[in-house]
Amino acid sequence: MSNNEFHQRRLSATPRGVGVMCNFFAQSAENATLKDVEGNEYIDFAAGIAVLNTGHRHPDLVAAVEQQLQQFTHTAYQIVPYESYVTLAEKINALAPVSGQAKTAFFTTGAEAVENAVKIARAHTGRPGVIAFSGGFHGRTYMTMALTGKVAPYKIGFGPFPGSVYHVPYPSDLHGISTQDSLDAIERLFKSDIEAKQVAAIIFEPVQGEGGFNVAPKELVAAIRRLCDEHGIVMIADEVQSGFARTGKLFAMDHYADKPDLMTMAKSLAGGMPLSGVVGNANIMDAPAPGGLGGTYAGNPLAVAAAHAVLNIIDKESLCERANQLGQRLKNTLIDAKESVPAIAAVRGLGSMIAVEFNDPQTGEPSAAIAQKIQQRALAQGLLLLTCGAYGNVIRFLYPLTIPDAQFDAAMKILQDALSD
């Protein structure tokens, strides 16, 4: 059956709200290669939206899941616990850059992790308010949509959203927003909208995902830490997209001296299996009463087995170092292209969490059309890319960190051609 035939069936069987970017259907995948039902091959620089830092079907991950399949697939951890969940929590506790002794709870999706981080913060503080940042993305459930600082397509037609959520600008040199602007906005909130003693948490992405890979300045993170300490507010770092070697360190927060109280994780944690988590200061994590946290599939044993494999792969294959090496090669390609492509307004990121932003060279305004044109040129040559950003004018790069050098070089050639056409 052809891609077009599957496409027509999709239109009849599934709602339009589940938007689909590609007009081809996956048949198989290995490492950084995706093959469709017609046999066409693509270099996958989307990785299921940052889920496959260790690549499609890494042999070690497949073996770990297959071994777990032979034992049991589900008990519901809250009913009958299992050792692998506890061991994974111990590993994350030892690795995560959070304040004080750590504890970890596992869930299923990134949005679920963020929801539970807010629950934990509210239980710990007894306060309702949460401050988030414009351009941030935290999920598609109602609380996480409220936290998300981007309207289209996530929020259209779904309001009203949960209250006691406030947004402030995220720093951006390109768009003229300084760290001080962000901090001044928080202080204005304290004066005009909610007193500091009613704020449970400040949540931020150290590198914004959907927002366009904007990197939090170290001065911002330090100032948030000071504000949280001063007012008894829980500091939450959302690492759903940035975690597990993508930025050149295991977590993006490893780039900063200041540590959050809670940290959310998902996506590449389990290499394609549905698993998320919240790790944080043990005293704060213990705030909810027994039964207050959990979920039927939370910490599913197959996904937990995959996560153990992911941590081993990252260590064994030195993927943090690999992320820095590949990211520098990508940055060099984009910076070189900038000399002859006036639409390139900025190249930014950490490690292999790199993005390029496009503006109209005539007006200087953000141009989603240029980003989409380059994305389509690349796709026509077999390179799968994703756009993002508040204006849809950013291309982000989320290749598996396990991609072979020759394939990465081929992708860079396609990218150069797409930028120069």
UniProtKB/Swiss-Prot annotation:
Query: E.C. number, please?
Result: 2.6.1.19
Query: What keywords are assigned to this protein?
Result: Aminotransferase, Pyridoxal phosphate, Transferase
The pathway that the record names for this protein is: Amine and polyamine degradation; putrescine degradation; succinate semialdehyde from 4-aminobutanoate
Statement: the UniProt record of this protein carries the keyword Transferase:
yes
Binding-site positions, pyridoxal 5'-phosphate:
110-111, 238-241, 296
Which GO biological process annotations does it have? gamma-aminobutyric acid catabolic process; putrescine catabolic process
Q: Describe the function of this protein.
A: Catalyzes the transfer of the amino group from gamma-aminobutyrate (GABA) to alpha-ketoglutarate (KG) to yield succinic semialdehyde (SSA). PuuE is important for utilization of putrescine as the sole nitrogen or carbon source.
Family the UniProt entry places it in: Belongs to the class-III pyridoxal-phosphate-dependent aminotransferase family.
EC top class, in one word? transferase
Catalytic activity annotation: 4-aminobutanoate + 2-oxoglutarate = succinate semialdehyde + L-glutamate
Q: Which gene encodes it?
A: puuE
| Activity regulation, short description | Completely inhibited by succinate and low-aeration conditions.
Protein name as catalogued: 4-aminobutyrate aminotransferase PuuE
InterPro entries according to UniProt: 4NH2But_aminotransferase_bac, Aminotrans_3, Aminotrans_3_PPA_site, Class-III_PLP-dep_AT, PyrdxlP-dep_Trfase, PyrdxlP-dep_Trfase_major, PyrdxlP-dep_Trfase_small
Annotated source species: Escherichia coli (strain K12)
Transferase among keywords: yes
Inducers of expression: By putrescine.
Single GO term (MF): pyridoxal phosphate binding
Q: Which PROSITE patterns match?
A: AA_TRANSFER_CLASS_3
Instruction: Name the domain of life this protein comes from.
Output: Bacteria
NCBIfam families the UniProt entry points to:
GABAtrnsam, PRK06777.1, PRK09792.1
